Amino acid sequence: MSDIEDNDGDEYDELSELRQRHKPESQPSVDEAFDLDDLLPTIGEFGKYQKLLVFGICLPACIPCGFCAFNQLFMADTPDDYWCRIPELLDLPLEQRKSLSIPKELDNDELVYSKCYTYGVNWTQLLESGEEDDLTTMEPNASWPLIKCPQGWEYNTSVVWSSIVIDFDLVCDQDIYPTIGLAALNTGGPVGVYLFGLLNDRGGRRLSYFVCLATLLAGSLMTSLSKDFWTWAGSRVIVGLTIPAVYQIPFIISLELVGENYRSFVTVMTCTFYTSGIMLLSGVTYLERDWVRLSYITSLPFYAYFLYMFVMPESPRWLLMRGRLEEALKILERMAKVNGREFPEAVHLKLEAQIRRDKLKKQKKKMANVGLADLCRTPNMRLKTILITLSWFANETVYLGLSYYGPALGTNQYVSFFLSAVVELPSYLCCWYFMDTWGRRWPLSLSMILGGVACVITVMLPDDAVDETLVLYLVSKALLSASFLIIYPFAGELYPTQVRGIGIGASSYIGGLGLIGIPFITYLGKDNLKLPLVIMGFLSMLGGMTGLRLPETLHHRLPQTIEEGEEFGKNWQFKDCCRCAQKPEILSQPASYENLDVLAGSSTNASEVELELRDSRRVREPAPRIDERTPLDTTASGSGRPVHRPSMKRLVRQMSVMDTQRTHDGTMQLTHWI
């Protein structure tokens, strides 16, 4: 029965091909695959237009994005010393006031003034019954009862001048409230990613970005005007809705308009500028320690980004997806003009064919009805989905937890926070190199395991080893930053094209749940400074070990269907996790869509350009069995000739609207999956 179906399919394909041959030349076939990546080598992959876009819009927009994510650490800073406020004794000198009204308690084998208790006596009556000279020599009576601070606290403001902790008295029984506020910020993230993702797809990149800016500024303004904790926490949820959308949207626009050979550069530069913004935040918070003014200052740059309304282009890919051909052509023609290139006239017909084909694809996708359940339907896909999600959860949770915990270490919180950002920069560059030489699995697992070990061994240091603890923390932060950059492309390569968006979305959402819980882990450091590091260290090592079981993707053809995804890595053996990826010998360049040198030639004939843009006719070949050891380029059995995969063009483009940079053998290189 299956043979009959195969024969019918072959006859149908031959008939379809025959019809396509006899179509008029002026009517492009719906089957003709066209992508902007075909056109960019002709009109400029990274010309003047893209440079203005990246360096004038994308990268400047990334700098203050860390402000709204981490300024809360300093807005909710707790002074080192505080004690019960006794209004009746405010006229007395500080030391006399504390010695009379505050009991002492044992802390680390040292007697210190209590932070949460005072003597429960009638101070007004006591003052009226005594003489002024008696007050200077009066000592607390051991029989006086102890009560919790009934009228608030006084604070030592020598380091922390102003914070919500001081204004709202969030200490003692309410000292967990700043942690709740941090969890509220992270709660908004997954919701915002979903909402702005919908707006991004339906309303366009420009509209989504400016709505995101307006939402962030509204939340920041509410933050500054808050008069109680719960209003402040609610405003942080609104700010959290825009994290990380406010960072991702201009990044997406840039990636969609630059050529494939420059997307890795844009990705690394984006991460670098984002980290530079975090470094800048440490200086801003050092100079401005009033939390209300800090909220205003850190939101101020986002007002300037509304000027982008006059210069930020809409994504041509999104316009084509929505069938808005003329608007897309106008942007592409302007890009070619600014780059000093000629725009091929034949592209207009190709774009019309692309729009018709995309509509057919959407109809077929609706009929296919692939969902989240397909990730767990077969055993190998189910195992890989679980492992990817666990590794993602551990990676994202520990990375953010370490970022939050930096100010708590060392002798100066501003210096510690600055150093925690500085160590990310070299880790990105090292990660970029090792990903494309050692593969994805080993750099990911090794960085997470070693980073976890660096956290755990802090428990072996004495309590007074402040500098040594900080050094181990910085080593761990650098390693986790590298792994944080790897997990996105690795997951994107492991999930089959058919369910890639669903898989990445599911893993990132589950990983986002860890961001809500990690503030409560760092809260444990109030009683034991090293306990959060130990917990995050074990979680990081667990995530790194789960990554070893995943199949390597470097130099392997990526799975497209769920069936191929089930086969990929199915024959995994223990020895596979003990070796790095080996680069296969490339006998010749494959016939893939990356070989677009002809488009960059000097041909000016429109018909020639149209032929150059047209796909080569695909030849039906039996689908090979795909497993972890299947290289991208194979040779014909016994012939020694390379068997090219003419379908590579369609294979790669189905992966994402942000196609990943590849080497000449088609291997995916570093990118940031959204």
UniProtKB/Swiss-Prot annotation:
Record carries keyword Transmembrane helix: yes
GO CC annotation, single: axon terminus
Membrane topology reported for the UniProt record: Multi-pass membrane protein
InterPro entries: MFS_dom, MFS_sugar_transport-like, MFS_trans_sf
Disruption phenotype: Defective photoreceptor synaptic transmission, significantly reduced phototaxis and decreased levels of histamine in photoreceptor terminals.
Any one Pfam family match given in the protein's UniProt record, by short name: Sugar_tr
Leader sequence segment: none
UniProt region (Disordered), positions on chain: 614-647
PROSITE patterns: MFS
Annotated TM spans: 54-74, 179-199, 207-227, 237-257, 265-285, 294-314, 386-406, 415-435, 442-462, 470-490, 501-521, 528-548
GO molecular function, one term: neurotransmitter transmembrane transporter activity
Keywords associated with the record: Cell membrane, Cell projection, Glycoprotein, Membrane, Transmembrane, Transmembrane helix, Transport
Stretches in topological domain Cytoplasmic: 1-53, 200-206, 258-264, 315-385, 436-441, 491-500, 549-674
Extracellular side, ranges: 75-178, 228-236, 286-293, 407-414, 463-469, 522-527
Domain of life: Eukaryota
Tissue: Expressed in photoreceptor cells.
Subcellular location: Cell membrane; Cell projection, Axon
GO biological process, one term: neurotransmitter uptake
Glycosylation sites per record: 122, 141, 156
Chief localization: membrane
Role description: Carcinine transporter which is required for recycling of the neurotransmitter histamine in photoreceptor neurons of the compound eye. Following histamine release from photoreceptors and its uptake by glia where it is converted to carcinine, required for the uptake of carcinine from glia into photoreceptor cells where it can be hydrolyzed by tan to form histamine and beta-alanine.
Protein name (Swiss-Prot/TrEMBL): Carcinine transporter
Name of the gene: CarT
